Amino acid sequence: LTTGLSSWFHNYGNLLLMLGFLLMIMTMIQWWRDIIRESTFQGFHTTKVYNGLRWGMMLFIVSEICFFFAFFWAYFHSSLAPNTDIGACWPPINIYPLNPFQIPLLNTAILLSSGVSVTWAHHSLMSNKLNPAIHSMTITITLGFYFTFLQMMEYIEASFSISDSIYGSTFFVATGFHGLHVIIGSTFLFMCLIRIIMNHFSST
């Protein structure tokens, strides 16, 4: 997938990228299938397995914090003391940044709202109320895909690209990485919604 993406960036076609995406999707589907079989139908997820999954999630979150720490470091390193190569000013000359009070502010509100709705879904599940959980999870997924759509529109309307100085690089890498997380999160939440609808719950 990484090699295919790099090849596509350098105009070598997207066949390898599509094959990588197909392989990743197949892996995700079969992994979800195995998790459902082992936990819901076979009862193989013991307390030790649950603890391992919790630790895995915590370590994953720590690794993501490190990722975004690096992105913010790059941004502040470049913006607080601009190099003479970019005119010693921030943003660089001929770079017209997006208005933070338009789509970025709306996307922030959407993400905060999705946090509220997914918390609603969690508390509904803990209270054994399936219908409110289904409704709130559907709202969360819809907000996630709406965020992705607005992010795409923001990229289309931007007057700069990823190759336009350090500003374009840090902007598109940081926001693109974040947008990728939203897409992956929305996909996983969609799988959770399917499991809620199919009543894949244990007695505990």
Curated annotation (Swiss-Prot):
CDD domains (alphabetical): Cyt_c_Oxidase_III
Root EC class: translocase
Ranges that cross the membrane: 12-32, 56-76, 101-121, 133-153, 171-191
Signal sequence interval, chain numbering: none
UniProt subcellular location: Mitochondrion inner membrane
Enzyme Commission number(s): 7.1.1.9
Membrane topology type: Multi-pass membrane protein
Record keywords, A-Z: Membrane, Mitochondrion, Mitochondrion inner membrane, Translocase, Transmembrane, Transmembrane helix
Any one GO CC term of the record: mitochondrial inner membrane
Stated role: Component of the cytochrome c oxidase, the last enzyme in the mitochondrial electron transport chain which drives oxidative phosphorylation. The respiratory chain contains 3 multisubunit complexes succinate dehydrogenase (complex II, CII), ubiquinol-cytochrome c oxidoreductase (cytochrome b-c1 complex, complex III, CIII) and cytochrome c oxidase (complex IV, CIV), that cooperate to transfer electrons derived from NADH and succinate to molecular oxygen, creating an electrochemical gradient over the inner membrane that drives transmembrane transport and the ATP synthase.
Family: Belongs to the cytochrome c oxidase subunit 3 family.
Record protein name field: Cytochrome c oxidase subunit 3
Organism: Enteroctopus dofleini (North Pacific giant octopus)
Lineage, broadest ranks: Eukaryota, Metazoa, Spiralia, Lophotrochozoa, Mollusca
